[in-house]
Amino acid sequence: MGGLVVLLVGLLTALMSVVSYYVSPKGNNTSTWQMSLILTFSCCYLLWAITYLAQLHPLEAPSRVLE
């Protein structure tokens, strides 16, 4: 289920990027708006995915110390 969540959120991010490409304000700096929004969505997705996957598959297993 963990990998599926990452894939679904990635598809949602791609959809939001495509929508932002067409909905961005028109004018002299349209391409700046488009790239800024797409980069924002992709960076937020990467930050979330790396954090989520690091918690899903930790490098060191948690250990319990009994006294």
Curated annotation (Swiss-Prot):
GO terms for biological process: proton transmembrane transport; transmembrane transport; vacuolar acidification. It is a multi-pass membrane protein. InterPro entries: ATPase_V0-cplx_e1/e2_su (IPR008389). The keyword Ion transport applies. One of its GO terms (cellular component) is vacuolar proton-transporting V-type ATPase, V0 domain. The chain crosses the membrane at residues 3-23, 36-56. Residues 24-35 are cytoplasmic. It holds the Pfam family ATP_synt_H. It is found in: Vacuole membrane. Keywords: Hydrogen ion transport, Ion transport, Membrane, Transmembrane, Transmembrane helix, Transport, Vacuole. One of its GO terms (molecular function) is proton-transporting ATPase activity, rotational mechanism. Residues 1-2, 57-67 are lumenal. Subunit of the V0 complex of vacuolar(H+)-ATPase (V-ATPase), a multisubunit enzyme composed of a peripheral complex (V1) that hydrolyzes ATP and a membrane integral complex (V0) that translocates protons. V-ATPase is responsible for acidifying and maintaining the pH of intracellular compartments. PANTHER family: V-TYPE PROTON ATPASE SUBUNIT (PTHR12263:SF0), VACUOLAR ATP SYNTHASE SUBUNIT H (PTHR12263). V-ATPase is a heteromultimeric enzyme composed of a peripheral catalytic V1 complex (components A to H) attached to an integral membrane V0 proton pore complex (components: a, c, c', c'', d, e, f and VOA1). Belongs to the V-ATPase e1/e2 subunit family. This is V-type proton ATPase subunit e. It comes from Schizosaccharomyces pombe (strain 972 / ATCC 24843) (Fission yeast).
